[in-house]
């Protein structure tokens, strides 16, 4: 199922989720060429202690861990596309795509921006053998107004089977 949410609906939905951070210090207020990103993790049947968060921008990957409360904080460059992957043993991994192109469009030109969102990791035992078809959310900015847009896709598909090839 693919849906498009308004920024207001996203803010309401995300305001009820938890809190935590990849680095000990929160990111400083960013210049208009960067965007601060804050993700809150909620882990069903567990803690965020062994969650790994991987960020990929332009083929370069970096990773970190959330703080004790499940909060992840980092800064992304503008005019880039980032894939953020959330992994926890025994849970279904999720990815979020963040496109910072058009972030400075419209009334937002020259203003500091930030993105806040929540991620819930469910136990793999609830959906055995299934994975998400792709990023569960795609966050971007409207080209004319600069307003944030969000599309979600929570379709589950069978996991690719790893098979040994014998020669």
Language-model region placement:
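Short Pro-Gly-centered beta-turn/loop motif in secreted/extracellular proteins
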Residues: 73-82, 89
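Compositionally biased low-complexity segments at domain edges in trafficked proteins
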Residues: 113-167
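Structural motif
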Residues: 26, 32-51
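Positively charged n-region of N-terminal signal peptides that target proteins for export
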Residues: 1-4
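A short, solvent-exposed loop/turn motif at the edges and junctions
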Residues: 85-102
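Bacterial N-terminal signal peptides
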Residues: 9-17
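Short, acidic Ser/Thr/Gly-rich low-complexity loop/linker segments typical of extracellular
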Residues: 60-71
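Boundary at the C-terminal end of the N-terminal hydrophobic targeting segment
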Residues: 20-28
